[in-house]
Swiss-Prot record:
Keywords from the UniProt entry: DNA-directed RNA polymerase, Magnesium, Metal-binding, Nucleotidyltransferase, Transcription, Transferase, Zinc
Gene Ontology molecular function: DNA binding; DNA-directed RNA polymerase activity; magnesium ion binding; zinc ion binding
Reactions this protein catalyses: RNA(n) + a ribonucleoside 5'-triphosphate = RNA(n+1) + diphosphate
Family membership: Belongs to the RNA polymerase beta' chain family.
Cofactor note text: Binds 1 Mg(2+) ion per subunit. Binds 2 Zn(2+) ions per subunit.
Protein name: DNA-directed RNA polymerase subunit beta'
Principal EC category: transferase
Gene name in the database record: rpoC
Amino acid sequence: MKGERTVLDVNNFDRMRIGLASPTMIREWSHGEVRKPETINYRTLKPEREGLFCEKIFGPTRDWECHCGKYKRVRYKGIVCDRCGVEVTRSKVRRERMGHIELAAPVSHIWYFKGIPSRMGLLLDMSPRSLEKVLYFVSYIVTDAGDTSLMKKQLLTETEYREYRDKYGSRFKASMGAEAIKMLLEEMDLDKLNDELRVELKEVSGQRKIRAIRRLEVVEAFKESGNRPEWMIMDVVPVIPPELRPMVQLDGGRFATSDLNDLYRRVINRNNRLKRLLDLGAPDIIVRNEKRMLQEAVDALIDNGRRGRPVTGPGNRPLKSLSDMLKGKQGRFRQNLLGKRVDYSGRSVIVVGPNLRLHQCGLPKEMALELFKPFVMKKLVKEGHAHNIKSAKRMVERVRSEVWDVLEEVITEHPVLLNRAPTLHRLGIQAFEPVLVEGRALQIHPLVCTAYNADFDGDQMAVHVPLSAEAQAEARLLMLSAHNILNPKDGRPVASPTQDMVLGSYYLTMERPGALGEGKIFKNRDEAVLAYDTKQANLQAMIKVRQPNGELLETTIGRLIFNSVIPPEVGYINEVAGKKALNNIVAKCYRLGGYKATAQLLDGIKSLGFKYSTRAGMTVGLADITVPEEKRQILADADGMVNKTEQQFRRGLITDEERYEKVIDIWTKATDTVTKALMHSLDKFNPVYMMATSGARGNIQQLRQLAGMRGLMADPSGRTIELPIKANFREGLTVLEYFISSHGARKGLADTALRTADSGYLTRRLVDVSQDVIVRDEDCGTTQGIMVDDVKDGPEVIEKLEERLVGRFLLEDLKHPETGEILATADNEITEEQAHDIAEVYDKVTIRSVLTCKTRYGVCRKCYGRNLATGHHVEMGEAVGIIAAQSIGEPGTQLTMRTFHTGGVAGDDITQGLPRVEELFEARKPKGQAIISENDGVVAIREVKGRREVDVISDTEERMTYTIPYGSRLKVREGHRIEAGDELTEGSINPHDMLKVKGIRGVQVYLLGEVQRVYRLQGVDINDKHIEVMVRQMLRKVKVEEAGDTTLLPGGLIDVFDFEEENTKVIAAGGEPAVARPVLLGITKASLATDSFLSAASFQETTRVLTEAAIKGKVDPLLGLKENVIIGKLIPAGTGMSRYRNVKVINLDEEQVENLDSVNP
């Protein structure tokens, strides 16, 4: 019997290899052969000997106890019982000990025979169909032709085989089943085959060349990995440990068992039957049938349903095979390795906690007691309330009064993590200091709701307790809500006042002409506030106040009160504070005063906002919604214009299409005029108007529908209906109007449901493609950069140059073109002020970018620039790839939810949104593709046989002709001068064409601009660098065109860096370098083409990825985050980087810590 195995220490290895298992290897892993299909004895409920749960093979079911009961207790550790043969050890070895089944006939492994492409078929140069005929005993295959006229590997039917037998006797050999294939595979000389294929490659072309390349790939894989081809045929089947395919007793004496046990049972039964038949010397046809059934049983065990009908259990449910255990959302990878359930956690409904400070959360008492139970028990013993842990536990369970005092002490300074699903970005998990509260609901600070996207209509949140000192330190320094004030996607504050707080601040800072006390002068702030408290002056009255520096300041009393919470470095805010203004105040405060001052400011605004929105006593009544008097006249005018247009159409002056467009235009203008009239007629202190203009709730569109007119609507197909809804909600809709409205509303809801799922899937793909992008280098020393200017959509500027420069590094120092003074240096990050100065004098600037970074795995600090979540230069080890993916994916869900609130009013509905982003990132051929010019030159347009053709004539008189498909609209005119890559027709450009014409830089700039366009049109700001990270990952690979003297295969995809390395070696040796062209991969393809097979397998197409990796004997270097999470190592980012591994964290006593608050993280 083998000795105790040492458990693998996760942190002790830095790469992981996968390969094919040889029969000897499988026997080495095994602790014994499983010979019987029995599982457990139904009377004694003990495992049957030599069965699938045998204790002799897999270890004892109870700790330190053998099967027959002769040896019990730990003192017999390691003894093998002489009666039952069971080793006395822990029962958990049943999770790791494997068994095996010796097969009476070899069978093929379905992954290698049936996968696409069939690896077995490629090696033997047979089609999968003929391979199937041989393996499943339909045809014979000639394994040795001897001196006959037969060919090796020729297929023969039963009758043909008999004829040849009669004709040639035993001069040739032919057989069927996996044995025949095994013989052929054993005979293979890979080196010889490799040379033959390389010669063939040079001679053939077309389909045959592609096939040769494919075969060569497989041959090389086997040659380099040390795997043998015959290992694809199995003589031995491994049996996984019984704890991984458990059998549990249900109440009522029945048993529930894993499907794998059924599948193993079928294999064992058929194998035993086959052995018996062979011993009896049964006729060939019976043996053959049994062998085929054994082959099918093993297929079902490995991958049920891959070939033929799946084996089903009760109720016609297909059984879950080994492959199914790994695949999909419920498979081993995604369910258990990438997402685990943890203890020390709880969940509850959330309610608002308006009195909390930004870094606090309210934790219900009973929940806190349960979460911190071990800490409380330890403290009770330490303080002498209990003698031992057991009595302390009893005290906690009985909830004695002293327990609460101890709990109070335990939770001070011990942060907890709060998480709300769905966690769309890193702000979905933040740390807070718990405050004990009565009741059973978690209390949440109102300002972190935006980050969590939480509201209080019944949302729930989960609480987790960081246990170790390290975890607590990270929670406090990195995850505390007061440190997460900025949004990583654009660097704007995410914790900024909303709703009531905005309304309160807006009301407080408004001015009311002619209010009580207007024009009074006060000697200082307190006197002014006193006048308000004693009702001598109104809150919104314009007054003058003497400043400490002696100046007279004209302001309102409300603004004086408001400024009492604004830190002095921000200055005096003497304007109406709506949502935008508040946002800017917070951003400025963070820039000038850091997160500490900002947290205080936010809490101050929160208190004031709530207080004064209550004081304001905002209500909404019917009288507040006043319909403007001009409305009737505006509608009458519009009706008149529509009638005129109809007349023109009837006379045949305009087409139906023109008429439709004109009518739509008339009504759109009418709606706008009504809206303007409405805004004009509303009182500035009208509660509805205040709510909309302050940005607290609602918008002008919704106001228009309440008091103006609803306007034009879309029908279910998205076409605008030319009959507008003239009424508003105040007046009420007619039946027809109501019916028209229902289309839009329904479409909004359906869209939301569908697109939320799409957005989630997009985020998942983005994370997967970029998860190994980490800041690994200080400076990569690149000499290339990208040229940036304003991003435009037609004439409109979507993103200004200034915004694109902030927080980046210049490629080289930049001087003022006239004065020659240095505007910014290449060694320092560009500040907001510098960016402003540069944009004043330059239209285009070259900056360092992730796109041109030369760091091999990841990016360097200089090319990345500022970390937007902190506002400082990015740290080493920051997982910028994940942040980028979250920053693009999280607003994706917002793109999806936008259509909902406007009730489907035409013109606001977007089809551009998410599908377009997906199309770009997947590098798909776009719908409505534009034709682009492949060369620079002048345009000439002509008609040929009723079709338009565009010629582009270059300066060297070269003429390129493009045929314009029917129905496309031209974008160029006769005589226009255009550049390569310019569009000739309207539509979206195919990025692959762009890559051919304009090269890598061109396609990078195009993708960046297009993605930005979609998001900006939705009003979502995302920083360029996040999109750059994705685009870089899409262009990581090159396709080898000619191999030269390298070992690369033509047509193979290879990483740019590997390609350059290979070429450098060959050139140094005086050989011919390989030639490759860049390829653009969609994010799904790029994720699957990653070096890490663990990451790819856990993403999609698990079996295909593992099949390929096993044949190649791939080594996973464990550089990304995902692979490390899967095997349970610390991730190589942040504090998990190797350079921080040996940092020790200790808990100090209170006295030793003087003042930690003054230390900036």
